[in-house]
């Protein structure tokens, strides 16, 4: 009985830790959601599913379009928060402090002329569950979070064949493990 209770508490603790991390990122978005200095975009899982289905259904034998449609259907949502009129460096630091280093792995880090750009992934069971891009400069800040269930090959294809925000920066850097 004690073992069952201990296992239940352990499972609940792990679940709450995952919820708390997602909640921290969501809180960051929510904190600035009503701030007029920011542009905000949310693309729902249903919209991604519809876009992927549209591509697959209209591929007409185009294998790349079929693959891309299936891949876009794997995206469970995209959140974007950006501004050109804020202290991007302090927001970058604040956003980075919300990401638990033991849950997110750094994929790419670029420091250039007073600006910072970082791609981080959250991986579970061999699949990338979240790709996050955070950038901050003197007067600009961007945070992009893409949720889903991807492989590194999937991310490479998204970078090469779509105009999803932030993927152009991803394609300039790491292509992930081979």
Predicted regions and their residues:
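C-terminal partner/receptor-binding element of secreted or periplasmic proteins
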Residues: 149-178
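Short Gly/Thr-rich strand-loop-strand
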Residues: 98-123, 170-176
């Amino acid at each position: 009985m004690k073992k069952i209770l201990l296992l239940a508490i352990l499972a609940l603790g792990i679940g709450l830790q995952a919820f708390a991390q997602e909640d921290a990122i969501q809180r960051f978005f929510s904190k600035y959601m009503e701030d007029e200095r920011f542009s905000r975009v949310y693309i729902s899982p249903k919209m991604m599913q519809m876009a992927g289905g549209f591509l697959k259904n209209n591929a007409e034998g185009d294998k790349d379009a079929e693959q891309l449609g299936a891949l876009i259907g794997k995206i469970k949502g995209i959140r974007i928060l950006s501004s050109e009129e804020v202290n991007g460096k302090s927001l970058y630091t604040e956003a980075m402090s919300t990401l638990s280093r033991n849950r997110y792995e750094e994929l790419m880090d670029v420091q250039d002329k007073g600006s910072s750009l970082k791609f981080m992934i959250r991986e579970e069971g061999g699949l990338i569950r979240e790709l996050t891009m955070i950038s901050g400069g003197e007067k600009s800040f961007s945070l992009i979070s893409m949720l889903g269930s991807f492989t590194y090959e999937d991310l490479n294809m998204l970078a090469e064949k779509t105009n999803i925000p932030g993927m152009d920066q991803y394609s300039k850097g790491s292509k992930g493990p081979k």
